[in-house]
Amino acid sequence: MHNINEICKDGQSLPLNTEGNLRVVFLGVGAAFTKRNRQSNFLIIQGEHHVLVDCGTLGPLALDDVGLSVSKVQCYLPTHSHADHIGGFEEVALVNRYVSNSPNKPKMIIQKDYQGLLWTKSLAGGVEFCEAAQGQPLQLTDFFDILRPQETELLGRKVWSYQHGSMELVLMRTLHFPDSAVSIDEAQWCSGILVNRRVWISGDTMFDRDYPTQFSDISEVMFHDCQTFQGGVHASYRELMTLPDEVRSKTYLYHYNDNWDDPKAWVKDSDNFTGDPIKDGFMGWAHQQVAYDFA
């Protein structure tokens, strides 16, 4: 069972702890170039532990929206190397090393192969030459303490699992980009997340019917990447409408475009859906800056 609750009442900051229950807070629910929402980065909180999944170009602003900052968040998990998901990590690295005066580095949960890719192809250019560490350029480990998920198997898929306090985080690869990829093996690194084997968040992905259908068997609530147009590297609303009723009925849609609330702009007369996800059998559009609380 879950409830949707208001956060930051009377200007209060979002607490990074709970009384033991699982909480998911989307700092944003928008697509990469959104102007009406923040980007789809989200906090997972349980007990005394938390993790921010992705920190895009608008991530530091989105944290400020809820009274937080990149120095207050102490654990991060990047899913893939697109700017709306990792564009804020340079600020995370630099603020925590040079501005906040914290004695501790923030933590990063990251799979081994992706760690090298994230650093060499995205983050190193902005931060590795800030100083000489024993005569060598800085490395990711100079900015973050690395927490390593372990490879295992779930539902016949290779996944990576990390126990973060009382929350279990299971990462699975997704079929996101390039758009020519027809299998996970041909795709660049991108991951979705299963939390406590209860809450599944697709991560960025093209439409991959088996992916949500398979995880719906063990998930209470699901959040699926959704765009309002066809093509590209995200699942479209039209494609998601082909999922079984029992999958849609437990799925919220997120990572959507700025015209989500104007279905006349993207629903065709020939479509057999309304563009209102509740009427169309989903749980609805996911909302930013509210708490999805799980008992």
What do these predicted ranges mean?
Residues 2-68, 145-210, 287-295:
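Core dinuclear metal-dependent hydrolase active-site scaffold
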Residues 19, 68-71, 104, 165-167, ...:
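Structured loop/turn residues at beta-strand edges in well-structured enzyme cores
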Residues 52-56, 73-84, 88, 110-111, ...:
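Active-site neighborhood of phospho(di)ester-bond hydrolases with catalytic His/Asp-centered motifs
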Residues 57-109, 218-221:
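Active-site metal-binding motif and surrounding structural segment of the metallo-beta-lactamase
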Residues 61-62, 85-88, 117-118, 210, ...:
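Phosphate- and divalent-cation-binding pockets in alpha/beta enzyme and binding domains
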Residues 99-152:
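Acidic/polar short surface loop at catalytic or gating sites that assists cofactor/ion binding
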Residues 48-51, 103-107, 198-199, 249-250:
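Short active-site oxyanion
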Residues 205-295:
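Cap/insert and terminal regions of metallo-dependent hydrolase folds
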